[in-house]
Amino acid sequence: MKVKFAHQLRAIAALSVVIYHYWGIFFSPAVRTIIGVPASFAPAKPGYAQHVMSPGQGGLIYGVFGVGVFFLISGFVIPISLRNISTGTFLVRRFFRIYPVYWFCLLISLSMYFICSWYWHTPLSDRTSLKYLLQTLPLLHSVTGMASLDFVCWSLAVEVKFYVIFALIFLAGRNAHKMLALSIGFLTLCCAAAYLAQHDSSPESMLSLLTSDMKFITFMFLGCLFYYALYDELTVAAALGYGAIIYVLFLMTAASYEGSIGGPLARNYTYALVLFSACYVLRDRFRDNRVLDFLADISFPLYLLHSTVGYVLMAILIDHGVAFTFAWVISLGVVLLVAFGVHKYVEIPVNAFGKKVSNLAGRPPKPVQRDALPLEGSP
């Protein structure tokens, strides 16, 4: 059974996030201030980028939509990753798949802060402090309410929490129905906790910080249902039934933060769910595509690097008289090149090493379908 559709959706998700950041967030004075660009720098936004931050009622917010697709892909492939290995082996492989690449890319992002400060003669951002870095390295910064150094690793922190939660539930029962019953029970408690956190606690309370990511994690469980249906562990009718319950829990949890059912996050994640569902139904029609497959292969380092590298390069290029369109195209080209290098010389070797380490720690895994292997990357 093919899973190529999910792998190629990584490319669509990554491009959606890049467009959102380059055509939208880049023009935010607050973001430019964080990286060290002076307030006097105020680039003009071209007409084709105007809709990105002002999509209108019900409009598509590229970045939110793209992250939603990433979360569904993760929910879909994590059960595949656990299919033939122990929970311990899974967690070891997840560590090596995520953290070394993340740390390497974080160093590149950190260097961009120094380059920006040197070029513009501005003070270094507080995000370059040792304290900030130490809290960001383990991807636990969201628990303390700290923003991401690279603007994007907050979603990676969500995924790490999901991996741990899913692995613990998986230990309790591998049967699909038992897994989902336990998951729904857990998500229901989280939904109630999120409501209490938003209505009876301060935004900075520990309960609020601990439950802030549950709207994302609940949504990720929807991706698991596609796996169970694909591998015939659930009938389509059963998957739809469980999906309806989890989707309602997602809407209710998101509403605790957005103030109403169907806010921008819930709406755009629903768009992501519609796209993923359509691609799942049409999965047999997906074929090799050099562009999509390449972007999907490097999507993890591309996602981690595009914001800080792009923001700094675009500002410098525009300051030298380069038009915005050429500036973002050149910056994207540089980011693609660097991401490819990280993928080839860091991500692939480290993943291979992680598999060797996990095999030494436990029983060697049974063979997994070849077409499922590329999907193990993150985000």
Indicate residue ranges for each PLM-predicted region.
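Juxtamembrane transmembrane-helix termini
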Residues: Y62-F96, F104-T122, V309, M314, ...
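Alpha-helical transmembrane segments in multi-pass integral membrane proteins
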Residues: K2-F5, I19-F41, K45-I61, I80-N84, ...
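Generic structural signal for small/hydrophobic residues in well-ordered secondary structure
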Residues: R10, V18, G68, G75, ...
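Membrane-proximal cytoplasmic C-terminal regulatory module of class A 7TM GPCRs
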Residues: I348-P379
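Hydrophobic alpha-helical transmembrane segments of polytopic
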Residues: A6-V17, L60, V67, Y102-C105, ...
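Hydrophobic alpha-helical membrane-insertion segments
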Residues: I12-F26, Y99-S117, L302
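Membrane-interface helix-loop-helix regions
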Residues: T33-F65, I98-V160, H177, C191-A193, ...
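Small-polar-interrupted transmembrane alpha-helices in polytopic inner-membrane proteins
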Residues: A14-S16, M179-Q198, Y242-V248, V335, ...
